[in-house]
């Protein structure tokens, strides 16, 4: 974020960090690196980066698997959890595929609050997937 204006601390990092302690998550090396960087971005209040990394982790975690195995899929998630991941993908796409100004990308306090809220929502969206991966770990 080019602005020096800092927004709120993201609360979702606490739950995600507790899941990552002791490497309990069944993440491959690619997803694990992205996961760690997402947590660092969230702590640094890099909200757009947090959203982009969260959505990317979902894609990688669902498709990264041992040779000969199938990816995890989303069948075990509830409809609201899948809807949250759909929102996350759409929000990430709005950030990385420029088609005009999107909410939260300005320098005003309102924009900082908007992107911070979306970053928090992004973290909350990936928690159910990470909790499932903890069970597989």
Predicted regions and their residues:
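Charged alpha-helical initiation segments
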Residues: 1-46
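A short, mixed-charge helix-start or loop-turn motif at secondary-structure junctions
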Residues: 19-21, 74, 108
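Generic recognition of short, well-ordered alpha-helical interface segments
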Residues: 33, 49-52, 90, 121
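Short, hydrophobic, well-ordered secondary-structure elements
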Residues: 39, 43-66
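Short non-catalytic regulatory patches outside canonical folded cores
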Residues: 60-88, 98
């Amino acid at each position: 974020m080019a602005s020096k204006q800092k927004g709120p601390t993201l609360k979702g990092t606490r739950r995600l960090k507790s899941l990552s302690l002791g490497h309990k998550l069944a993440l491959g090396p690619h997803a694990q690196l992205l996961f760690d960087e997402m947590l660092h971005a969230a702590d640094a209040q890099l909200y757009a980066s947090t959203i982009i990394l969260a959505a990317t982790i979902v894609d990688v975690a669902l498709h990264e698997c041992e040779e000969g195995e199938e990816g995890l899929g989303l069948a075990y998630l509830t409809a609201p959890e899948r809807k949250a991941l759909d929102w996350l993908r759409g929000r990430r796409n709005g950030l990385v595929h420029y088609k005009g100004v999107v909410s939260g990308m300005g320098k005003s306090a309102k924009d900082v609050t908007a992107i911070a809220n979306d970053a928090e929502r992004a973290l909350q969206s990936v928690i159910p997937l990470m909790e499932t991966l903890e069970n597989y770990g």
